[in-house]
From Swiss-Prot:
SUPFAM superfamilies: ATPase domain of HSP90 chaperone/DNA topoisomerase II/histidine kinase. GO terms for molecular function: ATP binding; protein serine kinase activity; protein serine/threonine kinase activity; sigma factor antagonist activity. It is an enzyme of class 2 (transferase). This is Anti-sigma F factor. Binds to sigma F and blocks its ability to form an RNA polymerase holoenzyme (E-sigma F). Phosphorylates SpoIIAA on a serine residue. This phosphorylation may enable SpoIIAA to act as an anti-anti-sigma factor that counteracts SpoIIAB and thus releases sigma F from inhibition. HAMAP family: Anti_sigma_F. It comes from Pasteuria penetrans. The gene is spoIIAB.
Amino acid sequence: MKRNRMEMEFTSCSENEAFARIAVAAFVAQLDPTLEELTDIKTVVSEAVTNAVIHAYGECSEGMMVRVSVEIEDTQVAITVTDRGVGIVDVEQARQPLYTSRPEWERAGMGFSIMEHFMDQVRVRSTPGQGTVVHMIKKLQASRNVAVVN
């Protein structure tokens, strides 16, 4: 059984979304995922971190942090994105396609739908005034590393 874990925390700024996406992808690369699997993971990290930055705190809130942790076990990847922002009043409503608390923004309201499409499991816990935890799990195909026998 292969098991590994990493955690990072950064200021809630949209510029840090790319850092989180790349760091998680680099960590998961040790499992030798397919390009599609890696793209799915990068996409959901981008969506979850962007949601935390925009909705939890407002853009680039000094002292407000987003935490991303990743745990791999065998071929399963578990990603958790946590903020201590405003929280979500109605999680089920927020998970509905096209629902957004920011209707003035083009392309808003698809974050949770995208996460649910690319991951095997998505759980959201939120308490208004205390923050939100998004936990996502994806089972990767078996490692493609094949021994060459002469």
